[in-house]
UniProtKB/Swiss-Prot annotation:
This is Glutathione S-transferase C-terminal domain-containing protein. Widely expressed in cell types relevant to airway function, including airway smooth muscle cells and epithelial cells. Residues 191-233 are annotated as: Disordered. The modification Phosphoserine is found at S233. Residues 130-332 form the GST C-terminal domain.
Length: 633
């Protein structure tokens, strides 16, 4: 491991899990996906370390045939990982300073794309993998269906399928059927109105039959790889647009206006756009993630249960089409993926699986439509003895002496207005007082959803004997925080770009200032699992909703009294606390905030915690000025 430490000053290290391999498939599939992306990007700027268990041989020659060709891979044990990586799920990337880590499949894959483009700016097609506004797989799995599908449900479902596959006809994973259904849904892109009108024009010119064939000659501008093997659908508008994007060649702008009957057509009369790739028209990171997973699934199906292929014809067509993307066959070959040639399937699976519209883990709410404001709901709670109630603030006048602290500690360094910086200081006074009174030397403190690091940097400076970890999904925010930390010379701080569920380390205190919506509930849950204290200031109550992990209300006491929709009424009005609103309306908003947070507090108490809901001082420090403080009993 000494060699690794020395090399970290020169390059980044990429750590990948390895448990076993079966029939050319590397487990976990996250590793297969990462290796495939490295091959597709022709990326050799990372030092790759395969992290194996004790039972796995450390002889890399045994793995050579199933890994990327011409890439050096080092085999290490989990005990040899840098300390920061030992606290994260793999894959993970560590920068040369050894205190900045990126963890989780989506975060790591996006980083690989960015670094590959920086190494060769001529490869503009790599940036196109990140999609419109570069947001592909950027949102966490808790709020993004595509991130959840690509990062969690599809890889896990196929891993389980591959483990359990036998000679008996298998049950097709519901996640596969959900993906099939998604491929049948109309495509939504930022300029879909324009494209749908172009498609209508094609259909009108062709007698509402097959699309125009004028694009056939134009398709020759694409690489030879794309021009071979496509069926007649290559003439469609969707495919022309998709493959022009792949070669970073926009369709030439037309100066002629569309005919009047096309311009005046109602949006409801326009034909829908059909999927070319997973998310819609364009080849993105989502396709990269899905390809190794779907390939290994189809290998088993086509070999043993080929009659099952009729259940997902759109997925099979996607699999065939993606092989024609420039560079995919080459990358797959380097990774040992030998593509299948599937029969053309004409049936659709939508009618065979009519119930796939339901999202697992999110129950359909059968409550009747709730009409009215929050008062009936609040009265209903009062009848059950549940009233707005705040615990007293432990020290409302306490404040840090910001004038004597180094400039980089102050939120003023976070590039905000003086008024906002003052309010941020007031918010920090509340959190820092509670945390510093709980913390002991040697404690590990985690600042979840840390943003620019305002909370974590102050705590690291004030508590030099504690280890502080900042966890944030937004890269630029975390980079700004690290810059401030470097100015202060802090040595007791880690930076982890990841969704919080990929942080697996033990800690003593969890902190979150204005974690949005259900992120507050995720922080509290994470702390409860670790039996850590928590200090959270919730935000964005209007975004609270049932997810695959959480159902609201959370506590048994509130569940017995309120329906989900009644709870949502409280959340909606809890967001109405802005200073420009009338005082009475803000008061009701504050009361709704308290009730929503009391539900969170009661749920934590049911898990063996002592919990207080406190109003921060001064109340003007933020419209969202509640603080939930929990300590394990």
């Amino acid at each position: 491991m000494k060699a690794i430490k020395k090399s970290l000053t020169e390059e980044e290290y990429l750590y990948l899990d390895f448990s076993h391999q079966t029939e050319g498939c590397i487990f976990p599939l996250h590793t297969s996906v990462t290796l495939f992306l490295l091959s597709y990007c022709d990326c050799k700027i990372f030092k790759i370390c395969l992290v194996v268990t004790k039972e796995v041989s450390r002889d890399s020659s045994l793995l050579r045939d199933d890994l990327i060709q011409d890439v050096e891979i080092q085999i290490i044990s989990r005990q040899e990982l840098p300390p920061i990586v030992q606290n994260c799920c793999l894959p993970a990337v560590v920068e040369r300073s050894d205190n900045f880590c990126r963890a989780g499949l989506a975060v790591v894959l996006r980083h690989i794309i960015q670094k590959s483009y920086e190494a060769d700016p001529l490869k503009k097609e790599l940036l196109e993998l990140l999609g419109f506004k570069k947001t592909c797989l950027k949102a966490c799995a808790e709020v993004s269906q595509w991130t959840r599908l690509c990062e969690l449900t599809i890889p896990l479902a196929i891993e389980n399928f591959l483990r359990e596959s036998s000679d008996q006809p298998p049950t097709i994973p519901v996640e596969i059927l959900q993906l099939e259904k998604k491929l049948s849904e109309p495509v939504r892109v930022h300029n879909d109105d324009k494209l749908r009108r172009q498609k209508l024009k094609q259909q009108k010119a062709d007698g509402v039959g097959p699309p125009l064939t004028k694009g056939k000659a134009k398709s020759k501008v694409h690489t030879q790889e794309t021009s071979e093997g496509l069926d007649s659908s290559s003439k469609s508008l969707e495919l022309k647009v998709a493959f022009s994007k792949l070669t970073v060649q926009e369709e030439p702008a037309t100066t002629n206006r569309e005919p009047s009957h096309i311009r005046k057509a109602k949006a409801s009369d326009l034909p829908p756009l059909e999927h070319v790739f997973a998310e819609g028209l364009y080849f993105t990171l989502a396709d990269i993630v899905l390809l190794p997973c779907i390939h290994h699934f189809l290998v088993i199906i086509s070999r043993k249960f080929s009659e099952k292929l009729v259940e997902f014809p759109l997925l099979a067509s996607w699999y065939q089409r993606i092989q024609e993307v420039p560079g995919v066959k080459t990358a797959a070959s380097k990774c040992g993926i030998q593509f299948l040639h599937l029969p053309k399937l004409l049936t659709t699976s939508t009618e065979q699986h009519p119930n796939l519209c339901e999202v697992p883990g999110v129950e359909e709410q059968s409550d009747p439509l709730f009409i009215g404001g929050p008062r009936p709901t609040m009265a209903k709670l009062m009848e059950k003895g549940i009233e707005v109630m705040f615990s007293p603030h432990p020290c409302p006048t306490w404040t840090l002496d910001w004038n004597v602290l180094p400039a980089a500690v102050s939120p003023k360094e976070g590039k905000m207005s003086s008024d906002r910086a003052l309010r941020k200081q007031q918010q920090l006074n509340n959190l820092v007082y509670v945390v510093t009174n709980q913390a002991k030397p040697g404690d590990r403190i985690v600042d979840f959803c840390s943003g620019g690091g305002h909370v974590g940097i102050v705590l690291a400076h004030m508590l030099p004997s504690c280890q502080v970890t900042l966890i944030e999904n937004k890269e630029l925010s975390l980079i700004r925080a690290k810059k401030r930390s470097d100015e202060l010379g802090l040595s007791n701080i880690w930076f982890i770009q990841a969704n919080m569920e990929y942080f697996t380390g033990m800690f003593n205190i969890g902190v979150a200032l204005h974690a949005c919506g259900v992120a507050t509930d995720m922080v509290i849950e994470h702390c409860i699992k670790t039996r850590a204290s928590f200090v959270t200031c919730p935000c964005c109550y209007g975004f609270i909703q049932n997810t695959s992990k959480f159902n609201f209300p959370k506590s048994e006491q509130f569940k017995k009294t309120l329906s989900y929709k009644e709870h949502m009424i409280l959340c909606r009005f809890a967001d109405q606390t802005a200073v420009q609103l009338p005082p009475q309306r803000r008061l009701i908003g504050k009361q709704c905030m308290c009730l929503v947070d009391l539900d969170r507090a009661r749920a934590a108490e049911e898990c063996g915690y002592s919990v207080q809901v406190i109003s921060m001082e001064p109340e003007s420090c933020s419209p969202k000025n509640n603080m939930i403080v929990g300590v394990p009993i």
